[in-house]
Swiss-Prot record:
Record's compositionally biased regions (Polar residues): 1-20, 62-79, 131-140
Lineage of the species this protein comes from: Eukaryota, Metazoa, Chordata, Craniata, Vertebrata
Protein family membership: Belongs to the SPAN-X family.
InterPro entries registered for this protein in UniProt: SPAN-X_fam
Protein's UniProt name: Sperm protein associated with the nucleus on the X chromosome N3
Amino acid sequence: MEQPTSSTNGEKTKSPCKSNSENDEMQEVPNRVLAPEQSLKKTKTSEYPIIFVYYRRKGKKINSNQLENDQSQENSINPVQKEEDEGLGLSEGSSNEDEDLGPSEGPSKEDKDLDSSEGSSQENEDLGLSEGSSQDSGED
């Protein structure tokens, strides 16, 4: 029983360790080769940034809400001018209400257009009635 068996032989136990270390080295080499390629792919994707383009129409019809927002922004941009205007108005004796009235507070262009179109439509109706009666008499 004192004879060395394959499992108890020191050299044979060392040989599997050597083969394992050799396999480990071989496995490390392909990993090292793959690592630079992966890093190159990552840098290639970062070289091309994503660009978003947004176009806005200038001739687009503006809603009344947007118009009021734009005017409020204009007022907030130049608070110094507004204060100067108020200071001049007080020295002249005029009220601030007259100066504070801007295009947004008074009747807007759209309102005036609506009023004029309503008036013209009423006139057209009146004219249409008189014309209609004359046309009816002409057809008989």
